[in-house]
Each structure stands twice: as C-alpha cells, then as structure tokens.
C-alpha cells in the first residue's frame, strides 16, 4: 500500500508538472500547430490512391526515413568510424593519406570516406567503448526500475533510428503515434541513446564509488562487460568483414 501511494503521488506530480509546462507554452504550441497545417507537414489536399508510402497527415514516408541509421551502423556508438566517419573526401583524412599512393590523390578527393546507408552525415553518433562497458556493467549491478527504463529507452531509440531498415516498427509509429509523422531524419532520435547510455554508466560508476567491494563480489559481471566491449573492438580491428560483409580493405 505504501509503494502504491508513493507511486500515485509521483504520478500526480508528473501530470501536474506536464500540465503547467503545456499551459505556459500553449500559445506557441497552438500557433506552431496552426502554421503546420499549411506546410508540407500538414494534411495534403492532393492524395494519390493506393500509394503505400504516404501518411494520413505529415511528411512522406520516404522523406521521413531518408536519413535512416543502418543496422550495422549502430556499432558507431562504440566505434566512431565503423562506417568511415563524416561525409568528407577521403583526401581530408591525413592519417589515411600518409599510407595512400600519392599518384591517386585526385581520385581520393572524389571519394567520400563515409560508406553507410544515409545520403550523408556530418559525423557518427558516438558514445565510447568505455562508457558502453559501464552501461553493460550497470545492467548487472544497478538496482531499481530506473535501470530498466533507461535500457528500454535506449533500445527504442535505436530501433526507431533504423527507420527504413526496420519498416514494420517505423510504420507502426508513423500510423499510430501522434505527431511522429511530422518529423524527419529518424536517425536524430539516437540523441536519446546518447543520453541514456552515459546516464546508466554514471549510475554504475556511482555504485562502484559508494560500494567498492562490489567489484570483487560481482567480478564475473565486470569481466563479462569488459570482455564484450573489448572483444567486439578487437574483432573490428582484425576481422571487420565479420560485421560488414561488403567491407573493402
């Protein structure tokens, strides 16, 4: 009963806070909504019949999912240049040019170093191998519902970022989640993972600082977390073709 009462109070506070926030910004929200009806994000008066990529209101499905994060591109959370990095000419990569044949400099100026699924990118979504290790460790040593909420939010953001590479899930959100069809560049939702992964990593670090003995008590989880991240990084270094069949060395 005590737990239920606390949950009810916390829920009520969240609802009241949300209502206050909405009421304070109601004018901006209303005018933005009103303006949106007259833009490409509003409902079109010209709707083609039997066209699968249209939404009932909002942007076109192909337009929304144009910048979809590749499934194998998700490894950039741990390894930043897993898909080549930013969409810039290979000639701008000084480290690569030191090993390249100078006779082909003009060709390198035409080749982009990014080879992922997106039309282009200014850089990968990167968290870091060490932070990922702490995140995995946090799944074992951190207690409480917050851990599972952060894990669920991380997985959800990754699945949504895949966009056209995971269309059944994307279609569900486009068809049934309000306002989702108003936004483009689904890969940008990985900003959630960029927040939740370090947050759980910090919670794990705090747990270790507060209870240093947990490192010896849960040593197998420490080894497992380190082994997973270090093992994958090592495989990337020596056998990238395992993860990317179309990889060209």
Which sequence ranges carry the predicted segments?
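Hydrophobic alpha-helical membrane-interfacial segments at the cytosolic entry of transmembrane helices
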Residues: 6-33, 48-53, 156, 220-238
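Mature extracytoplasmic enzyme cores
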Residues: 1, 234-245
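Membrane-interface helix-loop-helix junctions at transmembrane boundaries of multi-pass membrane enzymes
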Residues: 2-12, 96-108, 134-164, 213-225
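Transmembrane alpha-helical segments
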Residues: 132-139, 197-209
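Periplasmic/ER-lumenal interhelical loops and adjacent helix-loop junctions
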Residues: 27-138, 240-249
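Membrane-helix boundary/interfacial segments in multi-pass membrane proteins
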Residues: 113-125, 156-196, 209, 243-249
């Amino acid at each position: 009963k005590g737990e239920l009462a606390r949950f009810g109070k916390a829920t009520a506070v969240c609802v009241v806070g949300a209502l206050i926030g909405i009421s304070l910004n109601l004018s901006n929200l209303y005018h933005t909504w009103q303006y949106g009806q007259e833009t490409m994000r509003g409902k079109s008066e010209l709707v083609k019949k039997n066209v699968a990529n249209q939404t009932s209101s909002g942007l076109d499905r192909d337009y929304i999912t144009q910048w979809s994060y590749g499934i194998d591109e998700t490894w950039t959370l741990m390894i930043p240049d897993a898909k080549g990095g930013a969409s810039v000419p290979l000639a701008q990569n000084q480290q690569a040019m030191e090993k390249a044949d100078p006779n082909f400099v003009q060709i390198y100026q035409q080749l982009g170093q990014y080879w992922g699924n997106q039309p282009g990118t200014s850089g990968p979504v990167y968290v870091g191998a060490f932070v990922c290790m702490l995140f995995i460790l946090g799944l074992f040593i951190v207690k409480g519902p917050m851990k599972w909420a952060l894990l669920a939010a991380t997985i959800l953001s990754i699945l949504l970022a895949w966009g056209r590479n995971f269309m059944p899930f994307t279609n569900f959100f486009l068809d049934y989640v309000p306002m989702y069809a108003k936004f483009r560049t689904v890969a940008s939702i990985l900003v959630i993972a960029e927040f939740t992964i370090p947050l759980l990593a910090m919670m794990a670090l705090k747990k270790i600082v507060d209870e240093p003995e947990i490192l010896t008590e849960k040593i197998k989880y420490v080894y497992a977390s380190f082994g997973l991240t270090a093992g994958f990084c090592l495989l990337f270094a020596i056998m990238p073709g395992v993860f990317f069949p179309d990889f060209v060395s």
